[in-house]
């Protein structure tokens, strides 16, 4: 199949959720299909076959339109950095016109709220298919008249795996982390909405050590950084090429965000930690409960529960979290996407789980 994949502002490093998902889908689709990977306000990437094209904010561009028309796509995927907004729907309509009516899907990885004006325009501009990663978001968009489906989450299960005891010890020595400590980790944006202040209490517990890795491509909360460092947390606020090493040196992973826009709806860091067979303590965030039931080392934390008690239980119980994601690879997600792109609207109900 000839598929156009478009997402704005793509440039390495792909250490932010939407960019990361778009880049992985480009690569996975290109392994089996003929793919034209495009971005605007980004940078060419030969490894992905990604081409940066000049355009305005509404994607009105003779160059972009010409590239897509000459490619003669059979399907198109648009992963907007703004997710499902009225203007993103309008841009999807522009892309569809460039593709001469090729079936067009818009991928939204975060929920959005709409005014009455926005809802009215979205009903008029809806693309052929909207892919979401939570039942709630899919349902909200279906109520606006969109054909929706769930795109299964994915992780690189070859890159992210269980660490050996030797690897763990060596990495702790390299990063200056106490070898005998119970190490709990968080990877993602250094922002207050991630609820990272909760980690200060854990750092104060005897025998515990907290590691936080902040995204280098997003704005960081300076006061939060100072508080974490002041408490003795190991804080890494630069890009880490081998992010898997941070999971390998850890004993558990924590994701404590509660605000719905704090991350993409199925946070990649949670999937990566599961693939590394770490116990994971997470809020029931976004689409996580839609795809993963609690158990096997995955614990859902609610604010009324004492965090340190739940973390202690997670660290002391058997763990088999890798089994939760072993089949959820990027090639599998790409294959599911191609199936959804070829499905009639009547076949989409409940699709993607």
Language-model segment annotations:
Residues 4-6, 178-194, 200-207:
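Conserved donor-binding/catalytic core segment of Leloir-type glycosyltransferases
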Residues 40-43, 187, 209-222:
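Glycosyltransferase donor-sugar binding loop
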Residues 127-166:
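Donor nucleotide-sugar binding/catalytic pocket of nucleotide-sugar-dependent glycosyltransferases
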Residues 222-241:
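Nucleotide-activated donor-binding/catalytic signature segment of Leloir-type glycosyltransferases, i.e.
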Residues 255, 275, 279-282:
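Short hydrophobic beta-strand element within catalytic cores of glycosyltransferases
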Residues 255-271, 289-290:
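Nucleotide-sugar-dependent
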Residues 294-305, 312-316:
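Conserved acidic donor-binding segment of nucleotide-sugar-dependent glycosyltransferases
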Residues 305, 315-345:
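A charged, aromatic-enriched C-terminal amphipathic alpha-helix characteristic of glycosyltransferases
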């Amino acid at each position: 199949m000839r598929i156009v994949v478009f997402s704005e502002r793509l440039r390495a490093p792909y250490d932010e959720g939407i960019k990361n998902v778009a880049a992985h889908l480009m690569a996975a689709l290109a392994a089996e299909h003929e793919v034209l990977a495009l971005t605007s306000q980004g940078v060419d990437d030969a490894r992905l076959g990604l081409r940066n094209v000049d355009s305005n904010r509404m994607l009105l561009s003779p160059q972009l339109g010409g590239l897509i028309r000459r490619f003669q796509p059979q399907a198109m995927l648009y992963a907007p950095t703004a997710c499902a907004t009225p203007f993103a729907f309008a841009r999807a309509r522009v892309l569809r016109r460039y593709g001469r009516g090729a079936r067009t899907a818009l991928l939204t990885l975060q929920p959005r709220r709409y005014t009455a004006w926005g809802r009215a325009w979205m009903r008029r501009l809806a693309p052929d298919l909207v892919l979401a990663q939570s039942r709630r978001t899919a349902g909200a968009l279906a109520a606006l008249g969109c054909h929706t489906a769930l795109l299964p989450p994915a992780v690189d299960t070859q890159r992210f795996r269980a660490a050996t005891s030797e690897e763990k010890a060596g990495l702790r020595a390299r990063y200056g982390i106490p070898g005998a400590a119970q190490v709990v980790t968080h990877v993602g944006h250094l922002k207050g909405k991630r609820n990272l202040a909760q980690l200060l209490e854990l750092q104060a517990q005897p025998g515990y050590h907290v590691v936080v890795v902040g995204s280098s491509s997003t704005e960081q909360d300076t006061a939060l950084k100072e508080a974490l460092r002041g408490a003795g947390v190991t804080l890494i606020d630069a890009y880490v090429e081998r992010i898997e090493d941070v999971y390998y040196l850890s004993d558990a992973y924590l994701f404590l965000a509660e605000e719905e826009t704090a991350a993409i709806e199925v946070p990649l860091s949670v999937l990566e930690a599961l693939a590394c067979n770490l116990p994971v303590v997470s809020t029931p965030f976004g689409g996580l409960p839609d795809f993963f039931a609690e158990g096997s080392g995955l614990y859902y934390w609610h604010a009324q529960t004492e965090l340190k008690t739940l973390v202690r239980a997670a660290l002391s119980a058997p763990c088999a979290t890798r089994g939760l994601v072993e089949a959820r690879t990027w090639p599998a997600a790409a294959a599911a996407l191609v199936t959804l792109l070829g499905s009639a609207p009547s076949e989409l109900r409940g699709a993607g789980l």
